């Protein structure tokens, strides 16, 4: 499609099979007469990684939270410091071994080398969170079709990860049942509603009073439904499901033990982020600041790709940019990546390219 052959890739994974824990590692500095080296860092992280784990689980990520040198805590980078004893607090993400093997098999069949697995919530974090939010404490909520991936950052470090088996597809199902239409029609209605209502300028209640009926005649649905009541659609169908979603998110935040450490609130991203009533309902249930997260950390992308549904995909590219160097340059300027798309229909091709990677 783009004229580029894919030989390797970073793969995002998420869903209920994801779990996490925090671990502590301790080692003696290899040469106390010299500074702490990168080798010392690797050894202490490996010590933290040495946890008792079932054969059905596999570690996919180990993120250092902070280092402790001779009892001095709160160190973000210990390289170059002097000390005898080096410790580290880490956050470890694990996944189902079976699920990972099945994914590996697919990539092997395609002739694509899997560079690494990355939790999709962490990938989205790379694309939409600011360093300030991470330092203050923030919750990243990636709402996909059938799952919600959650990452909590405290003091600049990933400290908790989980996945909730609930997502935007459940809202679509509710609309299909409530309006007695097919799932395809329900999805079209949901997306159409999201485009019609600007969540950042007025609440859904205000809009519903001004425009009580939503005209969906232009969608040309097979059920021949021309309009629906906004009150029924928003208050009767969508809002109850959103309340349930945010109650699960709230319970997960409380379960993490970091509920009092996230003053930056929630950043909602993913394909379900623009669902009508998302911000209003979230603020009511969670009681914290909430914003919609879009991937704005890259240059050269057309506006259609600066969208919450592409956060995880953009995050994977940014993650790869940190780990792979092509020549002497990274991938910060995406104009060169897209230059081989033909002018005619390039926008559609680009959008379809990204949609291949959306779960």
Q: For each of these PLM feature ranges, what is it?
A:
Residues 179, 183, 197, 241-260, ...:
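Alpha-helix capping/termination and helix-coil
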Residues 13-14, 95-96, 195-198, 261-285:
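Glycine-rich phosphate-binding loops at beta-strand->alpha-helix junctions
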Residues 278-305, 310-311, 318-323:
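Catalytic phosphate/nucleotide-handling subdomain of diverse soluble enzymes
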Residues 173, 232, 236, 240-247, ...:
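Feature representing long, continuous alpha-helical segments
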Residues 1-140, 157-159, 182-184, 188-234, ...:
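Nucleotide/phosphate-binding catalytic cleft detector across ATP-hydrolyzing
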Residues 13-15, 140-147, 153-154, 165-169, ...:
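A short acidic Gly-Thr/Ser loop motif
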Residues 165-189:
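A conserved active-site cap/scaffold subdomain adjacent to cofactor or substrate pockets
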Residues 11, 107, 142, 175, ...:
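Residue-level signature of catalytic and energy-coupling elements of molecular machines
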